[in-house]
Amino acid sequence: MAITPNEAQFLALAEAPDDQPVTMLNLLKYKERADGGEGSGEDAYAQYGATAVAMVEERGGKVLWAGRADQILIGDPDEDWDQVVLVQYPSRAAFLDMVSQPDYLKAHEHRESGLERTVLVACTEAMSRLRGGGS
């Protein structure tokens, strides 16, 4: 499973409508041991996270929620996750700017070192529809 987006995925994100905040749903599965002797996969990811959170906040974004993934209720139980994180950015452009910065790319090495697999889903708000509101 890929740890980074492929070119087509990155281009699709860049070309998507960018008129509202975007929330990134992160599903994270850590390696038992990080590559390169960085301790556990979670330790390596925490090194990435310290830099990434600061960069998110510099762009007007925020971590909305983070928690342990306790149980797969629906789906393949072999596809378990260790952590779920929701990060909101004011726009897709803010996210794309962040991930193209040299400091981010350097920190991303720790992310790659610590993750066994991940899913990153770009989401836009639809709560008004769930409440029976407009479109």
Regions found by a protein language model. Name each.
Residues M1-D82, P90-A94, T124-S135:
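Short S/T/G/P-rich N-terminal loop/turn motif that feeds into the first structured element of a domain
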Residues L86-Q88, A93-S135:
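Short, Lys/Arg-rich amphipathic alpha-helical interaction segments
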